[in-house]
């Protein structure tokens, strides 16, 4: 359907019998109305043409060949005085054969039939609205008990005589002769309410607003009663309150959607378009048909038998009519949900027939496999691996995927820059992987975001936008911080990449879907880009050194194993000297020493710090103070060193750290400075 804003959408719900008939009804030039499927046949065994008024009828569902009717005529062969839209002989409309993918038919049921989804679903919507036990409603629908009090408000024989228990037996004896009389149909329509027709009458008599008011009053009474102390009674009261809330919500939903409750009982059964339930002829005279066709045949046969019995109701026994109604109900239940009545229907090879529910639901159903998970152009798929050098908004695309996605853009730029003269030569350059191709590809990718999606897409963070970069290999590289939004990890998970083509899609990707703009959970507002797993282990290894400060040198010096014998009588062991640990004036010098392998990642070192950033605690006492001949001194603390002159002025400060701490600090500092610049730019 298309709403007022021209957004294409799909809505599943209840429809009226008039709407079902409008989907399928056609009026021929001679005034004949077609659309009802009355025969269970499909194709004629001799001519291989669809049977008239059957499940594949061309009058109902449209022609098999575009513009050619069942007679073999085309629109050009129609006489001038005839309607050009229909064939006067066979009544087939001259339209495109693709109409058989969406043109529907219907089956006019001889008796009302309850929809199994609304009767046996959990919770049962019919039982909730009627406020009756599900077992009793099922017994009424499937004829387990033959008659009930009528739903009409006029006085009847059963209503007057069935109110007293001592008269029930005499009532039954007086009614039983009517089941074999010729006037059973009249008696049944007035005195007996059974089957789905009784459910439909009760649903039609409901006033949804009164249901909401009465349920609200009862809920308030139960709320005012409070707890009685009896666990069993309190439990029943809680269950009743939950039921009343659910009933009010259901009635409110029916009112808001303009849906009538009696539509849950079917009088017309829609028939799917033929292309959605095809019959395929294979080599060797083998025919492969959809299971839904067999289930439709079963419904039509039983419905025709019931219609025949109702026409001859004066001769047909009442028990036979009621039994046939039950068979029609079971056939429709099997069509909608084959497992609703216990054992599903099987074919001659003991294979279970697939019902409409089986075709729709599940991972291999119509929605998840065909509509939601179908293959689309300008998309790819690969395994994800960690990309530690990527920014939060970047992803690494393999060369093979990138050149396929951006092939048309690369061809356009090759021709625009006069690197090639036509498309054929451009494709050959791409096939031969010439250097100019990769240069243009990187230029194209620089201004074009891509979308990454991991199934199942349970919330909006399941698909996010990234700036692509070229990487070697055949895997997609991803920043580890964005994995939580996708619920992904690097143990073989796959992700799909899509290319937004239109300017509107690219603008939406940049403004709303970029990963660095989705840092909070849309459900609860908590940060969703937090370090986990590998990142936490990496940060731990990076900052594992320098925990005890300079005291570690006095009690467990760096490089001493537990089994190594230490000479504690040596006075130089406790004495601090500058030669033991290197001093660096900046972090760049420390990184250069690490690249030259003069220090390790967790080796302790002294780094000169800024004087304007005080790190000395007011109550902290130096561990050791060293004086030099020129009056300078060194105050040694647990994690820092203060160098002063003879005037007691601080000349420099050194902190005791490791290269891992320096690298971690630099990353945080750059991230904060980048955020500050971006924030000031937006202001």
Swiss-Prot record:
Q: Where does Mg(2+) bind?
A: 489, 491, 493
- Quote the InterPro entries the UniProt record gives: DNA-dir_RpoC_beta_prime, RNA_pol_asu, RNA_pol_N, RNA_pol_Rpb1_1, RNA_pol_Rpb1_3_sf, RNA_pol_Rpb1_clamp_domain, RNApol_RpoC1
Q: Where in the cell is it found?
A: Plastid, Chloroplast
The function of this protein is:
DNA-dependent RNA polymerase catalyzes the transcription of DNA into RNA using the four ribonucleoside triphosphates as substrates.
User: Record keywords: Acyltransferase included?
Assistant: no
Name-wise, this protein is: DNA-directed RNA polymerase subunit beta'
Instruction: Give the CC-aspect GO terms.
Output: chloroplast; DNA-directed RNA polymerase complex; mitochondrion
- Any one GO biological process: DNA-templated transcription
Where do the annotations place Zn(2+) binding? 69, 71, 87, 90
Q: Which Gene3D superfamilies match?
A: 1.10.40.90, 2.40.40.20, RNA polymerase II, clamp domain, RNA polymerase Rpb1, domain 3
Catalytic reactions on record: RNA(n) + a ribonucleoside 5'-triphosphate = RNA(n+1) + diphosphate
The UniProt record lists the EC number as 2.7.7.6
Taxonomic lineage of the native organism: Eukaryota, Viridiplantae, Streptophyta, Embryophyta, Tracheophyta
